[in-house]
């Protein structure tokens, strides 16, 4: 089976031939953790993503460009230093990445951190990935113009239709396999064996939520409330609310009557953002939303439903502990009011990832996380930052995962 070489762009190639090329020693010697050859390539790639024309068309790529700036890279690498002379850190070797098709820029984060850790990488880009992924591949290939030859010799991105034989070939050669996707696809890939020393790093289905403090909302300025609506819009609508960190349920915490007033205002402000951004939901999605929301009501999960045009639907949840974790369609928000933040705890499960918050103090949130004690929720972020990728993701410190330690205790 011939694979389409996306980066570096080249003739179609078979998996075995690609592995033979990538396992040769690169010019200038093997890559090291924090290798200058990779850093200089990543910063040049970041500049291409931050170019106004690209950032305007795909705003999500601007945050990727920001993540890969030299200062950010230095910060990430600084967290790696163990300050222990007897512990040396090295790359794992060959890392095989299988990213999801629905959030088509996530592969760049996991690839970039793995390359920064000094690994050779093979990334499968889904044939279904769309505009933003194409823009990323173009920017990567443009950045090659001034790159060290070691980049081409150690980093590959390919596209092929689902093919277990090809995936098995890459899996058998890998020292680490990184799988993003739904639970089913993670389990399918896991059936393909790895070398005995190798392991998987999995990012399966996750659910995320948003929480607003009723008192915090009341105390906030009109400007801060508007900004909260814009942040919530970015968190929810950028990837059609399908990203693992986009909120699926909105909680209000505090007095129920005041919460009603807050909800009305929030819905109005969000509606204004939707109009300002020209958010258009296609007819198929509008139908999907109605089917899934009426389905939730029929199942007794929701007690009432409200549509504000096709772009915004809100549902009242019957039980604060029975949460809707599946995707109901772009711009569909089940809501529930809780008396206290601690009432959220019984509802949280291991698969719950991001909590986007507005109007709480840091101490309140640390108290919540301590009460959760690891049963779920890997990150707590302000509105507008749900989709901001970080080198610690799903509870993993990725640079640590992408490296291995050798100790010299003599």
Give the label of every model feature segment.
Residues 149-256, 392-410:
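Conserved NAD(P)+-binding/catalytic subdomain of aldehyde/semialdehyde dehydrogenases
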Residues 121-125, 178, 356:
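Short hydrophobic alpha-helical runs that function as membrane-insertion/retention elements
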Residues 79-96, 102, 160-168, 313-330:
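Donor nucleotide-activated moiety binding/catalytic core segment of transferases
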Residues 80-144:
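Conserved small-residue-rich beta-alpha loop and adjacent elements
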Residues 92, 173-174, 247, 351-352, ...:
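Short, well-ordered alpha-helix to beta-strand connector turns
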Residues 239-356, 366-367, 372-373, 381-400, ...:
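NAD(P)-dependent aldehyde/semialdehyde dehydrogenase
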Residues 1-92:
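N-terminal Rossmann-like NAD(P)+-binding subdomain of aldehyde/semialdehyde dehydrogenases
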């Amino acid at each position: 089976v011939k694979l389409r070489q996306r980066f570096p762009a080249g003739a179609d190639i078979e998996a075995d031939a690609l592995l033979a090329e990538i396992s040769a020693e690169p010019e200038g010697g093997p890559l090291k953790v924090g290798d200058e050859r990779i850093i200089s390539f990543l910063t040049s790639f970041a500049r291409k993503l931050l170019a106004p024309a690209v950032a305007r068309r795909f705003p999500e790529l601007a945050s990727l460009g920001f993540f890969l700036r030299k200062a950010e890279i230095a910060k990430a690498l600084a967290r790696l230093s163990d300050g222990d002379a007897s512990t040396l850190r090295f790359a794992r070797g060959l890392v095989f990445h299988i990213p999801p098709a629905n959030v088509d820029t996530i592969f760049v984060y996991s690839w970039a951190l793995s390359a920064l850790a000094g690994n050779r990488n093979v990334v499968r880009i889904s044939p279904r990935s769309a505009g933003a992924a194409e823009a990323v591949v173009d920017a990567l290939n443009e950045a090659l113009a001034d790159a060290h030859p070691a980049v081409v010799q150690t980093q590959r991105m390919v596209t092929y239709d689902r093919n277990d034989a090809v995936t098995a070939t890459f899996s058998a050669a890998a020292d680490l396999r990184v799988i993003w996707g739904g639970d089913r696809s993670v389990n399918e890939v896991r059936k393909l064996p790895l070398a005995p020393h190798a392991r998987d790093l999995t990012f399966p289905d996750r659910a995320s939520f948003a929480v607003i403090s009723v008192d915090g909302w009341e105390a906030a300025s009109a400007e801060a409330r508007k900004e909260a609506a814009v942040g919530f819009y970015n968190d929810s609508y950028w990837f059609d609310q399908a990203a693992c960190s986009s909120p699926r349920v909105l909680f209000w915490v505090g007095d129920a009557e005041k919460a009603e007033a807050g909800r009305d205002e929030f819905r109005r402000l969000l509606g204004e953002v939707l109009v300002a951004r020209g958010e258009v939901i296609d007819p198929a999605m509008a139908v999907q939303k109605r089917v899934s929301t009426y389905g939730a009501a029929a199942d007794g999960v929701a007690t009432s439903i409200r549509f504000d045009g096709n772009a915004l639907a809100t549902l009242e949840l019957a039980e604060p502990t029975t949460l809707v974790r599946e995707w109901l369609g772009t711009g569909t928000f089940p809501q529930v009011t809780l008396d206290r933040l601690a009432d959220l705890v019984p509802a949280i499960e291991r698969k719950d990832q991001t909590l986007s918050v507005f109007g709480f103090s840091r101490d309140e949130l640390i108290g919540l996380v301590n009460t959760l004690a690891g049963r779920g929720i890997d990150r707590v972020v302000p509105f507008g930052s749900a989709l901001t990728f970080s080198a610690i993701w799903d509870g993993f410190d990725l640079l640590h995962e992408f490296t291995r330690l050798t100790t010299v205790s003599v």
